[in-house]
């Protein structure tokens, strides 16, 4: 990531669709209406397949009619646009038992893994528990499609002063002219004034299955973008995508 963004250049890559899907995940959304409204049709086929397998009425729509109904009919979208507890649900609202519930009562609570990740990066960046998981074995049978890329982990490290100097010069190139022979203390002071990050962050994700030609380039770009977003949120520099 330090050398550039990992977007494949040997075939057409619709970056807008990649970003739209990632934002859909981060919203905690599991209904394709948001995607359809933003002209992103990555998940249309999965929702339509679920409709065909479930619908018991007299009139069965074709796929184009189905997508149009999702876009224009809120009640239809609410009923048929859901994919079950897929990525967004697990990332932002993983359901679990509430251990603070009164005795003999069964309460549920949601765990926001993304918020927890951001919090832990700010408070304990050297932790080896900086993970997000979408493989909820208790809900796999409710998902239209179980997660292919099912989890990711982030790692951070301290940046050396030399690395921070390189970043500072990119932020404000004129510094190289005026501070080229500056002392170490002077450079540290300038880096602090410019709010140059002190740490770099890397991300590693896991997949159980992938369409190498079609899906993998999307996954690489999506997790690259996610790393950029997380790094921005915690004032770190994107380092390695693994």
For the regions a language model picked out, list residue spans one by one.
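Terminal, non-catalytic protein-protein interaction segments that mediate quaternary/complex assembly
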Residues: 1-242
């Amino acid at each position: 990531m330090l050398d550039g963004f990992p977007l494949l250049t040997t075939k057409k890559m619709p970056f807008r669709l990649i970003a739209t899907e990632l934002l859909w995940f981060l919203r905690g959304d599991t209904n394709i209406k948001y995607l359809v409204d933003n002209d992103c049709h990555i998940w249309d086929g999965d929702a339509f397949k679920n409709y065909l397998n479930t619908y018991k009425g007299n009139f069965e729509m074709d796929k184009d009619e189905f997508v149009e109904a999702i876009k224009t009919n809120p009640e239809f979208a609410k009923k048929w646009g859901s994919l079950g507890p897929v990525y967004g649900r697990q990332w932002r609202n993983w359901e679990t038992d509430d251990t603070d519930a009164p005795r003999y009562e069964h309460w549920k609570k949601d765990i926001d893994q993304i918020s927890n990740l951001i919090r832990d990066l700010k408070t304990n960046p050297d932790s080896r528990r900086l993970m997000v998981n979408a493989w909820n074995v208790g809900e796999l049978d409710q998902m239209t499609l179980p997660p292919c890329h099912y989890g990711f982990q982030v790692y951070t490290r301290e940046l050396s002063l030399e690395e921070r100097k390189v970043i500072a010069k990119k932020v404000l190139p004129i510094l190289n002219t005026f501070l080229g022979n500056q002392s170490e203390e002077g450079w540290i002071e300038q880096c602090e004034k410019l709010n140059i990050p002190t740490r770099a962050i890397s991300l590693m994700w896991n997949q159980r299955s992938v369409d190498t030609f079609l899906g993998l380039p999307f996954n690489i770009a999506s997790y690259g973008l996610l790393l950029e977003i997380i790094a921005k949120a915690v004032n770190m520099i994107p380092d390695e995508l693994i």
